[in-house]
């Protein structure tokens, strides 16, 4: 039995990195005494896979991991027992069974992610930036230099921006999130303001991931 677990990560837990989040859930699953399936071999480990890693300092209302169970049990019981082990800022949103024939690694199912970017108090630019978004998106290309592990390369951001909408105090984004074209909302935001001639101060805005999944544009 494979289940897909949706969880939120807010408050102090946003400073816990991806690898530590994985370890956190491994410990929580053991404390919950759930019948989790393990791999074979000399070093068995829980059979689980997480979706797109969340950056340190970013909150999320919709993150996922897939978990292989050694035996069937009600998803409501899995959710309740795991929720009892959650610390402040971490919450189990839902647990659902992955139907036979549709199982797969959570990461492989991700094509897009929704984000909310909001300016911190006193950090919103004083210039009229909201009226410039349509013009920014109308560009056939949005070239930026992306830093990789070994070098720099120029990429076109425009195909990776599925949605960019103005909110009262920031932006709503739907951005590409597959492993081949993962796009950070911070990069899009800073690129936009650089394009209109406004450089944002450090820590000008917060980022919250709302949901991940297939692109629904």
Regions picked out by a protein language model, each given a short descriptive name:
Residues 7-9, 67-73, 117-123, 173-177:
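Short beta-strand-to-loop capping motifs
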Residues 77-86, 128-137, 188-189:
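Short amphipathic alpha-helices in soluble, non-transmembrane regions
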Residues 102-121, 159-163, 214-216:
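Short, low-order "capping/linker" segments at domain edges
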Residues 61-116:
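Ordered, amphipathic secondary-structure segments that act as subunit-interaction surfaces
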Residues 134-216:
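Core RNA-modification/binding signature centered on pseudouridine synthases
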Residues 37-69:
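Short, charge-patterned binding micro-sites
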Residues 6-8, 12, 16, 20:
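Extended, well-folded interaction surfaces typified by the phenylalanyl-tRNA synthetase beta subunit core
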């Amino acid at each position: 039995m494979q289940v897909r677990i949706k969880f939120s990560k807010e408050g102090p837990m946003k400073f816990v990195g991806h690898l530590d989040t994985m370890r956190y859930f491994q410990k929580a699953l053991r404390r919950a005494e759930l019948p989790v399936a393990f791999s074979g071999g000399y070093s068995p480990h829980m059979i689980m896979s997480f979706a797109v890693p969340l950056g340190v300092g970013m909150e999320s209302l919709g993150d996922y991991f897939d978990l292989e169970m050694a035996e069937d049990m009600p998803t409501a019981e899995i959710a309740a027992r795991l929720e009892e082990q959650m610390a402040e800022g971490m919450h189990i949103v839902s647990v659902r069974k992955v139907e036979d024939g549709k199982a797969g690694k959570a990461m492989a199912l991700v094509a897009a992610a929704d984000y909310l970017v909001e300016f911190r108090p006193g950090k919103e630019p004083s210039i009229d930036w909201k009226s410039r978004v349509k013009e920014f998106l109308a560009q056939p290309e949005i070239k930026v230099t992306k830093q990789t592990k070994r070098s720099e390369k120029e990429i076109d951001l425009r195909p990776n921006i599925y949605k960019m909408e103005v909110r009262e105090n920031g932006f709503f984004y739907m951005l590409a999130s597959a492993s081949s074209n993962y796009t950070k909302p911070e990069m899009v935001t800073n690129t936009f303001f650089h394009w209109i001639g406004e450089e944002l101060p450090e820590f000008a805005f917060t980022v919250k991931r709302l949901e991940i999944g297939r692109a629904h544009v």
